Amino acid sequence: MSHCRQHAGGRRDGQSPGGQDICHLGDTFWAASSGGGSYAGRVHLGLIAIVVREYDPAIRFFVDVLSFELVEDSPALTNDGRPKRWVVVRPPGAATGLLLARADGDDQAAVIGKQAADRVGFFLHVEDFGAAYARMRAARVRFLGPPRSEPYGQVTVFLDLAGNKWDLIGP
C-alpha cells in the first residue's frame, strides 16, 4: 500500500525531489515521506495575500467582475494595534481564497501590481472561456493580448485592478 493510501485514502501523484510521495485527495495535496508517513499531515493552501490600494474597489473587482464570493469582511487589527479589515474572496466552490490586504506603508505600496515580479502570478480556470472572456471585456478588464490556443486549452493574460498579471484559462 502506498504511503498516500495509508493516510486518509489519498492517491499518489508523483514524487518530490526530496523523495517524498506527493499525495492527492480531492483538492488537497500533501507530501508523505517514505519513512513512514506525512511529515506535516494533510496540508492545503488556504489563502494567498494580494496587496491592494483600497479594500472596496478590490472587493468590487473580484466579486462583480470575476464572480468571486465575498467570504469574509471583518474588522481586525494590525500587529501594532491599528484598525484594518480581514477581507477574503474566492471563486465559488474553491478551497483557496485571496486575502485582500490593504497596503500599509511605502514598502507594501511599492509591490502593488508587481507581486509576481511582472510574471503571470495567478491562474483563473473557467468552464466557459468564451463567456468569461466576453463578460470581462464588457467590464473593461485590460487584456494583454487576444486569446490563444495552447495544448492545455484557451488562454489569455489579463490585469487585475492592482495590475497583477493573471492567466484566464479554459477548455
Spans of model-derived segments:
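N-terminal beta-strand motif that seeds the catalytic metal site of vicinal oxygen chelate
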Residues: 35-59, 120-122
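Active-site beta-strand termini and strand-to-loop segments that position acidic
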Residues: 89-93, 158-161, 171
